[in-house]
Amino acid sequence: RGNLKTGATQIKIMGGGGVMSDFDPIHSLQPSPAEIRAAVQAASDWGTYVLAHAYTAEAITRLVENGVKSIEHGLLIDDKAARLVKEKDAVISTQLYIFRKLLVSDYMTDFQKEKADLVRAGQENLIRLIKKYDITTGFSTDFIFGEYAGLPGEFTERALFWSNAEVLHQATAEGGEIVRMAGKLNRHGDFGEIREGWVADLLLHNGEVLEDLSVLANPETNLALIMKDGEIIKYKP
């Protein structure tokens, strides 16, 4: 409630252990079911939802059973938990590129590196289950290493597992769907699709992205136009 008072549009809780944390193992379960329900009730009272950091199937199951609507990361999910996510109309907001490419650093402790290796090993299973149950998944920016670090690389990483059109749908329509889960607290309006009456946020790139997603991975050279809410912010022919 304090975070909502200061302007939060949705609430994030930590559902289990983290890679970069110094003390908690990945398998640890953190909030109790009652604590999760209390957070969900507080968010619901304001017309919004709760998202949660979680890797393991056990954490995901506890969170979703108690009302959490978005799982951040989710790399160690199993079939039963994935089916539950779908049944409860929850989503998985994950990152692929950063775990395979960026989450390897000399400044990480041995404990952190062990945890990174553990969650990285679950990536292909997560992808398989997202496909199997047709779970909504957006492009998450829930990571470190600078503002939006590695986000352009997410396009080419996902293209290893999905068609270019599917990847674009995840980054736009599905991402918009997730943000709109904030309901009455959604400050962005209807966006994520090109549709009459919706927010006119558009990017134009020099290249055919349905044929080559690497066009999107190099915005410094390929991004020709940025339109924000109908206003041209950048134009470079």
Which ranges hold each PLM region?
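C-terminal cap of metal-dependent C-N hydrolases
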Residues: 186, 191-237
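Active-site core of metal-dependent hydrolases
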Residues: 14-124, 132, 136-138, 205-206
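Receiver (REC) domain switch/active-site residues of two-component response regulators
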Residues: 9, 69, 201
